[in-house]
Amino acid sequence: MYEPKPEHRFTFGLWTVGNVGRDPFGDAVRERLDPVYVGHKLAELGVHGVNLHDEDLIPRGTPPAERDQIVRRFKRALDETGLKVPMVTGNLFSDPGFKDGGFTSRDPWVRAYAFRKSLETMDLGAELGAEIYVVWPGREGAEVEATGKARKVWDWVREPLNFMAAYAEDQGYGYRFALEPKPNEPRGDIYFATVGSMLALIHTLERPERFGLNPEFAHETMAGLNFVHAVAQALDAGKLLHIDLNGQRMNRFDQDLRFGSENLKAAFLLVDLLESSGYQGPRHFDAHALRTEDEEGVWAFARGCMRTYLILKERAEAFREDPEVKELLAAYYQEDPAALPLMDPYSHEKAEALKRAELPLEAKRHRGYALERLDQLAVEYLLGVRG
């Protein structure tokens, strides 16, 4: 019942299960895994696809002939396993040249390098069949505001995004670009901090129809925000192209914990939203095994992410089918049809009628909404003691 299959559209990045456990205070605790080996292992686990940064597959500085050999070998593994590459993304954060930004560096040569690296990653992704290109502006931020740079970065980031969309069109690539917000880390503050800020940016681009969002559970939670609300807004805008799932404690550094290991109720409500919304995109686990783990623990982590998602999916579906839940929701959303015409599209006459209308507010002020009972039922389904 909780066994992952490719049709569940679960994906992992090469950098997730390939994480070697290095952190700011300690060296690697695991060996780097061969991308071909990772692909075969993920396929054995029932995964739909594997995502990658350019440098996850092709180390920086690799000569062209060697690069082509690496790609051929990886494509052969994809053919052998049936694994897809739904998404690629450019690493614009590791190279020391990006220390003060890639797209938003004050140095035009660094910006040009970020442009070129992005185009090369698009070419790589097209070879591998990718349809989504994620843009994560991890270095596009600041610690020192005295530069006044915050007034300039919006044009600087629009230029490459417009360029990349035009390049995709020129090359016949079907990419849609998923922008990934984050409030901070590795920079003290990142300019493109939340789902709302990215949605606002998209509408200033030349080809907004090619752009959407890749929200991440941890990133909105780091800022103390409600991730379910963020995803719902992206869905409402028709801009949820991809999603990063993991676990995160509020107001901490980016922990990238196993999905559902923290904030379990939020994870339950997120799965409920995704599965009831018609979202057809990948369910990508942008997380990694704890530093305490060896390779066996890495695969236990990957299985755990998917199993938890499927358990929460089953629990959410059972919750929505519960007769008492349906009754409570029907009562909650019951509307008096007499009130609805007061909120019809504006006209001068309707505005005057609204100001004259008798509103039965006294009864509304004393009404209870039974949300305590509804929430208790959700908790009981989550705990597995009901349904």
Swiss-Prot record:
Name of the top EC class for this enzyme: isomerase
The EC number(s) this enzyme carries: 5.3.1.5
Binding, Mg(2+) 2: E216, H219, D254, D256
Gene Ontology biological-process entries: D-xylose metabolic process
Gene3D superfamilies found in the cross-reference section: Divalent-metal-dependent TIM barrel enzymes
Cofactor: Mg(2+)
Keywords for this protein: Carbohydrate metabolism, Cytoplasm, Isomerase, Magnesium, Metal-binding, Xylose metabolism
Cofactor note: Binds 2 magnesium ions per subunit.
One GO CC term, this protein: cytoplasm
Catalytic activity: alpha-D-xylose = alpha-D-xylulofuranose
UniProt-annotated location(s): Cytoplasm
Binding, Mg(2+) 1: E180, E216, D244, D286
GO molecular function terms listed in the Swiss-Prot or TrEMBL record: magnesium ion binding; xylose isomerase activity
Homology family: Belongs to the xylose isomerase family.
Name of the protein in question: Xylose isomerase
Organism from which the protein derives: Thermus caldophilus
Gene: xylA
